[in-house]
Amino acid sequence: MCWRPLCRFLWLWSYLSYVQAVPIHKVQDDTKTLIKTIVTRINDISHTQSVSARQRVTGLDFIPGLHPILSLSKMDQTLAVYQQILTSLPSQNVLQIAHDLENLRDLLHLLAFSKSCSLPQTRGLQKPESLDGVLEASLYSTEVVALSRLQGSLQDILQQLDLSPEC
């Protein structure tokens, strides 16, 4: 009889019995830190300072605006739209921000799971119909407006996380 697999299993079992779950406040702190990091990345892109998040730009109505009260579900949906818009932009400025948004959404899913919420699957959202046409006509404006509104939305999400948002 071969004892090696049994020994490996027992060694792994002893290790797993000491592993503890990450406290939810740690996940919430990581979420806030990532939001602040994304906001800093947006601030580092100099041309985003020229447009207000509240400014209306014709043809860019599909970019989410500010929402005063956000549930975890609404936060995730909003970030999914921004992620989709940013990944459609050819600019290298927004590539890391798009990846950060995916990580932020994963953290929001962990927060929702800790509250026994199940967030709807938003990974396969369809691209807004007008996005391709707008990108072709005004790539620069789309990037500036999207980043400006994303920054405002992230500030709202940061405030809502302190209020322990609902599902």
UniProtKB/Swiss-Prot annotation:
Q: What is its main location?
A: secreted
Q: Extract the Pfam families matched here.
A: Leptin
One Gene Ontology cellular component annotation held by this UniProt entry:
cytoplasm
Q: List the disulfide bonds.
A: 117-167
Q: What PANTHER family would the database entry show?
A: LEPTIN (PTHR11724:SF1)
Q: What does this protein do?
A: Key player in the regulation of energy balance and body weight control. Once released into the circulation, has central and peripheral effects by binding LEPR, found in many tissues, which results in the activation of several major signaling pathways. In the hypothalamus, acts as an appetite-regulating factor that induces a decrease in food intake and an increase in energy consumption by inducing anorexinogenic factors and suppressing orexigenic neuropeptides, also regulates bone mass and secretion of hypothalamo-pituitary-adrenal hormones.
Its recorded name reads: Leptin
Query: What's the source species for this entry?
Result: Rattus norvegicus (Rat)
